[in-house]
Amino acid sequence: RDCLLSRGLGDVYKRQAEGGRDYNTVDMSLQRMFNYYLPPFKAAVEAGCGSLMTSFNLINGMPATADRWLIEDVLRKQWGFDGMTVSDFNSISEISTFGLSEREDAAAFALKAGTDMDMVSGLYFNTLKDAVERGDVDEALVDKACRRVLEAKMRLGLFDDPYKYCKPERLDRDMYNEAHRTAAREIAAETFVLLKNN
């Protein structure tokens, strides 16, 4: 993790706790979840990961982005995760697609479940102020989520120099560097697993 941070990169482990196929659902027992699907995420937490992305789909009937048990009880309380959680692409807006809330209430559900950052839907920005004013969301939850997002930015050095990673010379030096590209190809080649050899 320090190696990533020193290069201005954050780590996001995706997608807790199961994949599913977009609008498909994942039905499984707790035994299967804890023995097969959650161990890699727990290992990432134990290794000090800085952020974790919730999955897009339903897990046992609940959108993972709005699953308080999964985010707060398992991830934070049982495993001690103190980093930032981020929704999968537009998944907070999609809570209403699953029929579990109106679109306007989806952000409140996700925030109460422990999802700190809304990726793309804009619902946190557009609806949480009104939800706090109505008393539907405790302002302390907004503060807690904001703190985690700001801590992630602090670790990346964005408060010292917000444009530090927007320098064109970094493209050739860091991103398009031949040694880095070679290493990336080698790492990718080692990830393939032969399932069946005919």
Show the residue positions of the predicted features.
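Glycoside hydrolase catalytic-domain context in secreted enzymes
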Residues: R1, R7, D11-N198
